[in-house]
Every structure is written in C-alpha cells, then in structure tokens.
Design a protein with these regions (language model features):
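Conserved functional micro-motifs across diverse proteins
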Residues: 20-150, 200
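Extended low-complexity, serine/threonine- and proline-enriched intrinsically disordered segments
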Residues: 76-88, 272-283, 512
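Oxidative protein folding and maturation machinery
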Residues: 339-513
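A structural signal for short, hydrophobic beta-strand segments that form beta-sheets
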Residues: 40-42, 49, 87-93, 139, ...
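N-terminal glycine/threonine-rich, aromatic-flanked beta-hairpin/loop signature
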Residues: 160-199
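Bacterial Sec-dependent N-terminal signal peptides
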Residues: 1-25
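A non-transmembrane, solvent-exposed segment enriched in polar/low-complexity residues
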Residues: 143-151, 184-411
C-alpha cells in the first residue's frame, strides 16, 4: 500500500510539473550507489533508493526502508543531499515526520519520499546524508544507471532470461560459475570489451557489446544473452515463475555443500571480530548440538567452506560478519558476494533461487514477547491467544509479501509458510515454561503435537524443529511422568536421559527404574 501511495505521489508530482510550466522532470529509475555505509550493521535500517526525480522546484528521493517490525527509526531535519560540494536541505518527507521516532509496521517495510531543495538537472552524482553525525545514515555516490552502466569495473550482471546473477567484473579478476577467473587477455574498443579469462585449468571467452537501454549483450563461452546491471542490494525478483514446491530430499544420505564467498570492503572492526568465516547448523539426528564449519579468510576477505550435510539444512552464515540465515542443499555449490560498501548480498549458483529470494524477502518474524512473560504472570490460555494473533499477523505479512512479487517461487512460498508454522509451534512450547503457575494443559500440548506431525521432511530444513521436538517430549514427560511440587513440577528433562542411561549401564543395571 505504501509503495502504491509513493507511485501515486510520483504521478501527481509529474502531472503538476508538466501542467505548471511544461518543463520536463528528469527521472532516475533504480539508481545505483557506490556506498551504503550502514549496510553491514544488521540492527540498523537497510535503505534502498529506488527512484529520484529532478523537478524545477524540488528533488524527490524515493526510498524503501527495511527494519525489524515495531522498532523505530528517525531522520533528522538536517538531512541533506550533497552534489558538487553544495548542500541541498530536506524540506519534508511523505511517510514519516523528520526529527521524530517512526515505528515500523508489522511488515518491517516502509516506502517514503523525501523532498529536497532542487538539485541542478545536470547533476551526475550525489550523496544522501542524514546530517553530519558519525552514525547517521549515509548513502554515497548515487548515480543514474544510464551513466553507471558504462563503467564495467566493478559491476555485477544478471541474465535477463534466467534472472540469475551470472558474472561479475572487477579490475583484477572476474567471478563466474562460482569461481575466480584471471584476465589472460583484456581488450577494450570504446564501450565494447573482449576478454579471455582463465581459472588455471580452462579458458573462457567473453565478448561484451556496448550498453543499450540499460543492458548489454554478452557472449560467454559462445553463449549469447542479454544482461542487466544489478543495481539493488539483493537480486531483483526472477522474471519467470518456478513451480518447484520443495527442497532437495536426500532421504538423510550424507553429502556436501560447498560455499565460496567474498566479504568485500570489510571494515577493520569486522576483521577484528575474527579472520575466519563459519557456517553453522544444528545436528538434528546425533548430538542435538551446533555444528560449525570454518574457513580462513584470505587478505581480500575470500573463503571456501565444505559443509557436510545429511539433508537440505537451515544454516546460519557467520554471526560475526554477515548474519545470513538461509538453507543449503547437499551437492550444490554456492557463491556469496557480501559487499560492505555497496550493500550487495547476492548468491551465485546453478540452484540458488530460494537463497536469493530469502535475502530479498526475509520471512516475517513472529513477535513472541509480551508483558508479564518473564515474570510468569500470564495464564496459558492468554498466552495462546497472544501467540496465535502474532502468528496470524506474520502470516498476513508473508501473504502480502508474496502478492507483491508475482513470480516468487513456489518453493519460497511453501518453505516460508512451513517455517512460520514451525516457529509458531516452537514459540508456544517455549512460552509454556513461563506461564502462570506453570499450568500448561494437555489440550495445548496436543495442539502443538498436531502441528509437529504436519511439518514436512526433511526436518533439517527448519532449525526450530530441533528445539520443538525436545520441548514437545519435555511437555509429554511433564504430563505423564512428573510429580507436582507446589506450583512447579519435578521431572527429568530429556537431555539428561542419555547420560543417566550410560551411568546405569556401567553399573550393570538394565533400566533406570
């Protein structure tokens, strides 16, 4: 709804401009920025400027904001644009009030329009600065795509037919097929390029035509296709539908996923956090503990990790550096570009559509906190009502998210829906430990058990399935085998069972009883 409102505002502004003086408003669609300096902090807002309008009386900057639901953001009234050394102050903003805390909606997404003093229409590049504070928002080097597309180094390109990020060009090497390629030959004639790339084992011929209408025709290894410059921080929506409904299921036969990546332009504070990159997941079938696979970063911030998996698995890709929560499938190779300066977070690979969609469209969160929870003041029935409403809110936000992206894959839709359901069930049982008087009736346990039985395989694709299963066993044990102890219950937690059985076996006892 916010995006529709912003578009209507844009149309109205254009009409007003044409009617008032007949002079044309210059528009930049999907401009590209050199630097989005708060990108690397996951607890800060993610800002994407998706449109700029240069009118005679003002410059309008259209911005998409992503931030956790119900958290607040604020833009100071000293916000300005900087072009050719001159400041152009903000006048007002549609969608939020300057210098006031603005709370994000439950979707965690907001579209706003900033109105600034008019920039010259011949402006080639400008900065967006929220005042001069050290931690204020800064988006630097904002440029029209028609100008930026002429600069090949550095740039990322997606195949228009498949929608995949297929190749990236940098001064010293190229990225293609999840590998690094050195320039064996490098020729340029005007806006046309021809390269011979090598990875040390084989060569690759690349021919690039001059840009036309924001695109370039490229021939890679003899295959010609149309390519578009990637201007957004995550990969844009794919151009075609995908009816694949589920992740790969190996039926729990061990295999390996390979993750290659580059933490480009990583700030010193992140280097200081550690010079290793890790991929972590929970071992669902053996130890019920976290498994971590690590790789040393080279001097540029590049890495390669082999991740042994028993099936398609939800993983956390390094809490110290990138904070990515995604799914890896056995037998696949992924390349992750995470650029701390430009803001790019994109996967390359033969089968990485879901991973890119999860980056572009994070699954809405369920807010499982409520007043009185940690003081054990809320009765079970009230807790159930609160969490049900929070789940329905997140489910509604997911539905709206899917409706906005007509071509989003069936796999994303199914995975996100089941992910929310698993999280909801886990939140209920976690909340059960904090209900008033520790009374959590059988009917609610049975309700969660019903959800648990409906969760599809492979179970490893949902991290919360681990906690959900343990908590469900604990609740069943409490109901069947616990002893009332005042307002609490005395019973044996499941994580004590293996150790207790080992001790009794060592004493030649056949059972615990």
């Amino acid at each position: 709804m916010k995006r529709i409102l912003c578009v209507l505002i844009a149309v109205l502004c254009l009409c007003t401009c044409w009617a008032g003086n007949g002079k044309k408003t210059i528009v930049w669609e999907q401009p590209i920025a050199e630097s989005n300096q708060l990108f690397y902090d996951p607890f800060q807002s993610q800002l994407n400027i998706y449109r700029v309008e240069f009118a005679d009386d003002e410059t309008r900057v259209f911005m998409h904001i992503t931030f956790p639901p119900h958290y607040w953001i604020k833009f100071v009234k000293e916000t300005y644009l900087l072009a050719d050394g001159k400041k152009y102050l903000v006048k007002n903003c549609d969608g939020l009030k300057l210098d006031e805390e603005h709370y994000m909606p439950s979707s965690g997404k907001e579209d706003v329009v900033f109105h600034f003093a008019p920039l010259p229409k011949k402006t080639r590049k400008f900065d967006f600065l929220e005042g001069d504070g050290k931690k204020n928002f800064k988006i630097l080097g904002i440029e029209n795509i028609d100008t930026r597309i002429k600069q090949l180094f550095s740039s990322l390109w997606r195949n228009d037919a498949t929608g995949d990020w297929e190749i990236g060009f940098y001064e010293d090497f190229a990225i293609y097929d999840c590998r690094y390629w050195q320039y064996k030959q490098k020729n340029q004639k005007g806006d046309k390029y021809s390269f011979i790339l090598t990875d040390g084992k084989s060569d690759l011929a690349v021919n690039i035509d001059k840009p036309q209408h924001g695109k370039r025709t490229m021939s890679i290894n003899g295959k010609k296709a149309e390519y578009s410059l990637i201007t957004t921080s995550t990969l844009p929506d794919y151009p075609q539908k995908d009816e694949t409904t589920s992740l790969k299921d190996t039926h729990n036969k061990p295999d390996t996923a390979i993750v290659v990546g580059w933490l480009r332009n990583m700030p010193k504070e992140f280097w200081d956090r550690g010079q290793e990159y890790s991929v972590q997941y929970y071992d669902l079938f053996s130890t019920f503990k976290e498994v971590s696979n690590c790789s040393k970063l080279d001097s540029l911030g590049r890495f390669e990790i082999k991740v042994p998996l028993i099936n398609s698995t939800e993983v956390f890709m390094d809490w110290k550096h990138t904070y990515i929560n995604t799914v890896l499938e056995p037998g696949e190779t992924y390349y992750l570009l995470y650029d701390f300066k430009s803001g790019h977070a994109i996967f390359m690979g033969k089968n990485c559509r879901l991973q890119n969609e999860l980056l572009a469209h994070p699954i809405p969160m369920i807010n499982a906190d409520y007043a009185g929870k940690y003081e054990n003041k809320v009765p079970a029935q009230e807790m159930m009502q609160i969490l049900e409403s929070r789940y329905k809110e997140a489910e509604g936000n997911l539905r709206k998210q899917i409706e906005k992206s007509a071509a989003i894959s069936k796999c994303y839709q199914e995975y996100a829906a089941q992910y929310l359901l698993c999280t909801y069930a886990s939140d209920i049982l976690q909340g059960a430990y904090s209900v008033k008087d520790n009374v959590f009736p059988q009917e609610y346990v049975s309700q969660v058990e019903k959800i648990w039985k409906e969760i599809p395989q492979p179970y490893t694709q949902f991290r919360d399935y681990n906690m959900l299963t343990k908590d469900l066993i604990d609740q069943e044990a409490r109901l069947k085998y616990s002893t009332p102890m005042g307002k609490t219950y005395g019973f044996l937690f499941t994580n004590y069972y293996p150790e207790l059985l080992r001790k009794h076996k060592a004493q030649d006892r056949k059972s615990v009883v």
